[in-house]
Amino acid sequence: MTAIVDIIGREILDSRGNPTVEVDVVLEDGSVGRAAVPSGASTGAHEAVELRDGDKARYLGKGVQKAVEAVNGELFDALGGMDAEQQVQIDQTMIELDGTPNKGRIGANAILGVSLAAAKAAAASYDMPLYRYVGGTSARTLPVPMMNIVNGGVHADNPIDFQEFMIMPVGAPTFADALRCGSEIFHTLKGELKKAGHNTNVGDEGGFAPNLPSADAALDFVMAAIGKAGYKAGGDVMLALDCAATEFFKDGSYVYGGENKTRSRSEQAKYLADLVARYPIVSIEDGMSEDDMDGWKELTDLIGSKCQLVGDDLFVTNVTRLADGIKNGRANSILIKVNQIGTLTETLAAVEMAHKAGYTAVMSHRSGETEDSTIADLAVATNCGQIKTGSLARADRTAKYNQLLRIEQELGAHAHYAGKAALKALR
C-alpha cells in the first residue's frame, strides 16, 4: 500500500523569485506527499550543496533543471517500489547514490525534496498529520517563535551589521497568544519607525530594514515597541539576535562596516556579553564566525551559562560538526535547517544528538522560502520548543505560523506551549 509508484519533480519559484525544487511522491494507495525546498542567503561554507544549473541565459544561472532531472530520473529509478515508511532506507539510498560527502552530485535540493515528500506521503497514507507520523504520540509541544522583526546584514540594505533582531514571546500561555503578542509588537514597531521617519518596507523574512546606525539603536526601537504594545520586555517578551558573524569576519577580526569599527575575537565576545547585560537577550545565533573555534569557546565560557548560543553556520545541522562542538564546549544550541544537511533522517539525528547532550535545538526556515509548512510540523514532532520562521508579514512566513495554530487547535487540551521552559536561562 505504501510502495512508491511515482516521483515527480518540478521547478517552482521561492519567495525571492528564484527557482527551487518541488517534489511529489505518489504511493500505491494513491496517497501523495508534496514538499518544496527552501534556499538560504547567508549560507555556511560547510552546508550540503544546493545544485544550480549555472546557465546564465536562464534564471541568471539559478535554474534547478538538473536537480529536477535527477528527481525524475536517477532518484525515481533507485526508489521506485520502495516502501515510503522506510525513511532511513530511502534517505540512505539517496546518500549512497549521490556518493559525495556534501550531496554535490545530485544536489541536496533534489534529495531533500524527495526525502520530505516521501515522509508526507507515508503520513497521508495513514491519514495522520506529519507531526504525529514523525513524532509519535509524545509530539505535543508548540514552539516559542523567534520573530525576526528588524533585519540587517545580508538580509537588508542598511548599515546594521547584525542580520536579525528577534522577539520571543515566552510569557504567553499558548502559541496563539504568543503569535498575537508578536503581531501587536510588529505593528507597533512599524508605527514607531514611521513616526521617526524610517522606511517600513520589509526584507526577505518580513522584518523591517530601517536605516539605523547600530545594534543598540535597533534594540532600543524593539524595546520601545514591546512596551508601547502593552508587554513587558524581560518578562512577557525576551530578545534574540542572529549576528551572522561569518559574514563580517575578515582576516581574523570582526569588521563592522556599518559602525566603522573592528573588533578582535575577545572584543567581539565582550561586546556580545555587554549587550546581554544591558538588554533582555536570551539567545544569540552565530555570534562568532563558523571557523573561529577559539572565539566560540571564549564566547561560550563567557556567557554560555546565561544565554543560549546557537550554532548555525558553525554546525550546519551536521552531526559530525555538532559532536565536535559538544566535545569542545562550543555553543549550547543548534539551529536546525533541513536543507543544510539534505535529508529528514539526518535532520532528526542532529536534533536527537543535541537533546542528548543537553543542547537546545531551534527549528528554522531559510530566507528563500515557499508556502511549504513542513518545518512547523517538524518543530512539534521533535518537541524542540523553539522555531525561527521570520516575521509577521509575507505569506511564506505566516504559512508556518498558521500551520502551528492548526496543530495547537487539533491537539486541544494535549497541546503544551513551551514558553520559558524552552530556554535554559529562564527555567
Swiss-Prot record:
Pathway assignment: Carbohydrate degradation; glycolysis; pyruvate from D-glyceraldehyde 3-phosphate: step 4/5
Gene assigned in the entry: eno
Q: Name one Pfam family in it.
A: Enolase_C
Query: So what does this one do?
Result: Catalyzes the reversible conversion of 2-phosphoglycerate (2-PG) into phosphoenolpyruvate (PEP). It is essential for the degradation of carbohydrates via glycolysis.
| UniProt-listed InterPro entries | Enolase, Enolase-like_C_sf, Enolase-like_N, Enolase_C, Enolase_CS, Enolase_N
Its catalytic activity?
(2R)-2-phosphoglycerate = phosphoenolpyruvate + H2O
- What is the organism field in this record? Rhodopseudomonas palustris (strain ATCC BAA-98 / CGA009)
Query: What GO annotations for molecular function exist for this entry?
Result: magnesium ion binding; phosphopyruvate hydratase activity
Specify the protein name: Enolase
The entry's Mg(2+)-binding residues are D242, E285, D312
**Cofactor names:** Mg(2+)
What does UniProt list as this organism's lineage? Bacteria, Pseudomonadati, Pseudomonadota, Alphaproteobacteria, Hyphomicrobiales
Q: GO terms for biological process?
A: glycolytic process
The UniProt entry, under Gene3D superfamilies, shows: Enolase-like C-terminal domain, Enolase-like, N-terminal domain
User: What residues form the catalytic site here?
Assistant: E205 (proton donor), K337 (proton acceptor)
The Swiss-Prot or TrEMBL record describes its family as follows:
Belongs to the enolase family.
User: Keywords, A to Z?
Assistant: Cytoplasm, Glycolysis, Lyase, Magnesium, Metal-binding, Secreted
